[in-house]
Design a protein with these regions (language model features):
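Canonical Radical SAM [4Fe-4S] cluster-binding loop centered on the CxxxCxxC motif
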Residues: 1-11, 63
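Fold-independent oxyanion-binding glycine-rich loops
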Residues: 34-35, 66, 203
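Acidic-enriched, low-complexity/disordered segments with a strong bias for Aspartate over Glutamate
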Residues: 8, 13, 36, 78, ...
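Short coil/turn segments at secondary-structure junctions
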Residues: 1-5, 36, 169
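Conserved AdoMet/S-adenosylmethionine-binding subsite of the radical SAM
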Residues: 14-23, 27-29, 38-189
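Auxiliary Fe-S-binding modules of radical SAM enzymes
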Residues: 147-268
Length: 268
């Protein structure tokens, strides 16, 4: 995270980060987030992209941005931005723009034109959105968003459940209600619009909500900080008031394909 102030995850000097990425050959995928990288001028953004592209093992550069939704003219009126993408998003090493469209009304003609300009410049696009109370916490609205995105070639990627922290608690949705909204939206969509996953960005990893029964709710680690949690499946008794993963106190069952030292061993 490079662009926000007063945050332990943020840095204004990216040289150490670039050095770490260069020296860590396991890294093939880098995400620029913040803040919003595309608020930067092209003259400030391009050197970062250039240095990342010069690292041989970095195959994908991702840019998390709301710009295509709220200011598509940043794309449409800056030929140098599109030229930068043409230069550094290559046939074998793509740049992905992780767009943040939260409501179908944001998909204006100008926004769609901007998205097409990015695609014409060789950029791959996906969309991710938080589920926001009063904005898209409605199956019809979410289904319309998924469908419209699929129609224009922007696959739905993640729907995030928001942790209820100071400042956003008003907009957060309980996990089980969010799952119900999400699944009702998906059944209103055709196949290509169904690809989103409902997740939480938890300190222990990215946790997907994968199902519910009358009594239980099920989670799976889509990505984990600890190796033994990779693909770990967990079942809890339902708690309709739970707003975050930590509100489920004790798993009634869990299963992992991996142990810390033996990734080919099944454990339970």
């Amino acid at each position: 995270r490079l662009f926000m102030n007063e945050n332990d995850e943020v840095t204004k000097d990216i040289s150490e980060g670039l050095k770490y990425i260069k020296n860590t050959k396991e890294i093939n995928n880098v995400l620029l987030t913040g803040g919003d990288p595309m608020i930067l001028s092209t003259s400030k953004l391009e050197p970062i992209i250039k240095q990342l592209r010069e690292i041989e093992h970095v195959r994908i550069i991702r840019i998390g941005t709301k710009v295509p939704a709220f200011n598509p003219f940043r794309i449409l009126n800056d030929p140098s931005l599109l030229e930068m993408f043409r230069k550094y998003s290559t046939n074998e090493k793509k740049i992905y723009v992780m767009a943040h469209f939260n409501h179908p009304r944001e998909l204006t003609p100008q926004a769609i034109e901007g998205l097409n300009a990015l695609m014409d410049a060789g950029v791959s696009l996906v969309n991710q959105t938080p589920m926001v109370k009063g904005v898209n916490d409605d199956p019809d609205v979410l289904a319309e968003l998924f469908s419209k995105l699929s129609f224009i070639g922007v696959p739905p990627y993640y729907v995030f459940l928001c942790r209820p922290t100071l400042g956003n608690e008003t907009y957060s949705i309980p996990i089980e209600k969010g799952y119900e909204i999400f699944e009702k939206a998906r059944i209103r969509c055709s196949g290509l619009a169904k690809r989103a996953r409902l997740v939480m960005s938890h300190e222990s990893g990215k946790i997907e909500v994968v199902g519910m029964t009358e009594d239980q709710i099920f989670f799976k680690y889509a990505r984990a900080a600890n190796e033994e949690d990779n693909a770990r499946f967990l079942a809890f008794y339902r708690n309709p008031d739970a707003a975050w993963f930590d509100d489920y106190k004790e798993a009634i069952e869990e299963f992992s394909l991996f142990t810390k030292n033996e990734t080919n061993v099944v454990t339970s």
